[in-house]
């Protein structure tokens, strides 16, 4: 492929990305706590997606675990999680173990879990209407009862009609979805905020001049300092942080305020 300069070498296998937001009836169906979170954080901001979706032209898993074939994977993830984990040092040495907890699905009202459950159902409806749909890979789906309308269809002749009725999920199906999500959730590669800029009493690590609280002569200027996630690729955010950090440091070297 290198010798013939195959164009595939410049392809990341992701041809489609999208931002997804639920309809008003879908929000209401997720319960009053979800409705409250939606009204507070999303309803008046139409550019803020509930979920981000990347359609990848491969199987996002161990290829040795499935038969050879052509696969498409829909990756769903939230850019605005409510759950919070933690990462703390436990001693002064570089090899002292970290106190680390990812904190998946630990938010008070299970908003993150409800987001993922809604997203699973939504992306499934989208993909089974695409022209290339020829079935579902059981390894990438919850274990529904064979008698359930939600049961995986491993081989079909083509997509369902655009106006086909959506799959109806029972309480048993929802429990299967929840279990599958809890067992398979992972972190994507845009994580940030582990040393967020905020007041110390609000669990902040750095102040507005990038100084680490309680440490003299140490600044942080990378993607760990944003106080919350951003709804997109993080390259531009990193560049802005770097530019602003340069201004702060240059000003301090010239004798300006800001050095602790």
Language-model segments: residues:
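C-terminal structured subdomain/cap of oxidoreductase catalytic cores
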Residues: 73-132, 167-260
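A Trp-anchored, charged/polar loop motif used as the substrate-binding/catalytic surface
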Residues: 68-72
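Mid-to-C-terminal "cap/lid" subdomains and adjacent gly/pro-rich loops that border
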Residues: 1-67, 78-79, 109-110, 114-121, ...
């Amino acid at each position: 492929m290198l010798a013939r300069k195959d164009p595939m070498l410049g392809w990341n296998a992701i041809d489609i990305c999208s931002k997804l937001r639920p309809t008003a009836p879908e929000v209401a169906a997720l319960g009053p706590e979800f409705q409250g979170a939606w009204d507070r954080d999303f309803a008046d901001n139409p550019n803020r997606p509930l979920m981000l979706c990347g359609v990848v032209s491969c199987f996002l898993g161990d290829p040795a675990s499935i038969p050879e074939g052509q696969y498409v994977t829909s990756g769903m993830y939230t850019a605005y999680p409510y759950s919070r984990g933690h990462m703390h040092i436990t001693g002064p040495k570089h090899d002292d173990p970290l106190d680390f907890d990812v904190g998946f699905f630990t938010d008070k009202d299970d908003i993150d879990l409800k987001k993922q459950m809604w997203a699973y159902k939504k992306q499934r409806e989208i993909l089974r209407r695409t022209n290339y749909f020829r079935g579902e890979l059981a390894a990438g789906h919850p274990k529904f009862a064979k008698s359930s309308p939600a049961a995986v269809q491993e081989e079909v002749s083509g997509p369902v009609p655009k106006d086909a009725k959506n799959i109806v999920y029972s309480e048993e199906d929802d429990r299967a979805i929840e279990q599958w999500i809890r067992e398979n959730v992972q972190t994507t590669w845009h994580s940030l905020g582990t040393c967020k800029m905020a007041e110390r009493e609000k669990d902040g690590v750095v102040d507005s001049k990038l100084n680490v609280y309680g440490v003299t002569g140490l600044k942080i200027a990378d993607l760990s300092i944003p106080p919350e996630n951003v709804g997109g690729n993080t390259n531009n955010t990193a560049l802005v942080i770097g530019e602003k950090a340069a201004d702060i440091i240059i000003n301090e070297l010239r004798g300006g305020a800001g050095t602790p």
